[in-house]
Curated annotation (Swiss-Prot):
Summary of the function given for this chain in its UniProt record: GTP-binding protein that is not required for the biosynthesis of Mo-molybdopterin guanine dinucleotide (Mo-MGD) cofactor, and not necessary for the formation of active molybdoenzymes using this form of molybdenum cofactor. May act as an adapter protein to achieve the efficient biosynthesis and utilization of MGD. Displays a weak intrinsic GTPase activity.
MF terms (GO), sorted A to Z: 4 iron, 4 sulfur cluster binding; GTP binding; metal ion binding
GO biological process: Mo-molybdopterin cofactor biosynthetic process
Gene that encodes the chain: mobB
Record-linked SUPFAM superfamilies: P-loop containing nucleoside triphosphate hydrolases
Superkingdom to which the source organism belongs: Archaea
Keywords: 4Fe-4S, GTP-binding, Iron, Iron-sulfur, Metal-binding, Molybdenum cofactor biosynthesis, Nucleotide-binding
UniProt record similarity statement: Belongs to the MobB family.
Positions with a binding annotation for [4Fe-4S] cluster: 155, 158, 162, 179
Name the record gives this protein: Putative molybdopterin-guanine dinucleotide biosynthesis adapter protein
Domain 4Fe-4S stretches: 134-196
Cofactor note: Binds 1 [4Fe-4S] cluster.
Organism: Methanocaldococcus jannaschii (strain ATCC 43067 / DSM 2661 / JAL-1 / JCM 10045 / NBRC 100440)
InterPro entries: 4Fe-4S_dom, MGD_biosynthesis_adapter, MobB_dom, P-loop_NTPase
Entry-linked NCBIfam families: mobB, PRK14494.1-1
Length: 234
């Protein structure tokens, strides 16, 4: 799963651009939209509202066509962590200007009458002025510049820290898949991502894959997730 942001001030065309991306891309894309408005998405008096007020940490409403999760506010890191469990190619983040900067996520900056120029920095992968863009150029930027979210791991295996790595990707001096987290193996210990060099990642991945494939009901797996409760290995 790779991420890229779309930022700009009000009426700069952010949502319209994302709509066009979704219409023209053949990739599986999730969208995160930030709003400063205090929107009440659940209605007072409904069953889900009552259950949430009664103390449910998460309330899930399932209909025949949609599923909605009601929970407390989540920061961008936690939202991305949840989305990583889905079979998604890209996540487009609308807004979250400060979080994008903090998490070193590249972005497309939308300008309207030059308004928004202050948002441009060394993580800006593309600048779009006054709605003028070619959608193929936008898709090319997304496919080449979106990165795997590192959460500021700063492991150094790529030869950079996370901030300078994204800067290098934006400038074309590095590829997004130079990051060790893009190699298909993610090791998480007690909630902390543990970086592994490609050689170690390949050994771990190949070993687990070979073991899993011997189990009944496993046929040509595409993704494998193993969670171990160490306290129960006694």
């Amino acid at each position: 799963m790779r991420v890229i942001g779309v930022i700009g001030y009000k009426d700069s065309g952010k949502t319209t651009l994302i709509e066009e991306i979704l219409k023209h891309s053949d990739k599986k894309i999730a969208v995160i939209k930030h709003t400063k408005e205090d929107v009440e998405v659940d209605k007072k008096g409904t069953d889900t509202y009552r259950l949430s007020n009664a103390g449910a940490k998460i309330t899930v409403l399932a209909t025949d066509s949609k599923t909605v999760f009601f929970t407390d506010r989540m920061d961008l890191e936690n939202i991305l962590s949840v989305l990583s469990d889905y079979n998604i190619d890209f996540v487009i983040i609308e807004g979250f200007k400060e979080a994008l900067k903090r998490l070193n996520i590249p972005k497309i900056v939308m300008l309207k009458d030059k308004d928004g120029s202050d948002l441009i920095d060394d993580h800006t992968a593309m600048i779009i002025e006054d709605y003028n863009y070619n959608i193929d150029d936008v898709l090319k930027v997304i496919y080449e510049k979106a990165v795997v979210p590192t959460m500021n791991l700063n492991c150094g295996h790529c030869g950079y820290n996370c901030r300078t790595f994204v800067k290098a990707v934006v400038k074309g001096e590095a590829r997004w898949d130079d990051c060790v987290l893009a190699k298909g193996i993610k090791i998480i210990v007690d909630g902390k991502i543990i970086p592994a060099v490609p050689f170690v990642s390949k050994i771990v991945g190949s070993t687990i894959k070979a073991m899993i494939e011997t189990l009944k009901g496993v046929d040509n797996p595409k993704t494998i997730k193993v969670e171990i409760d160490v306290s129960k290995l006694k």
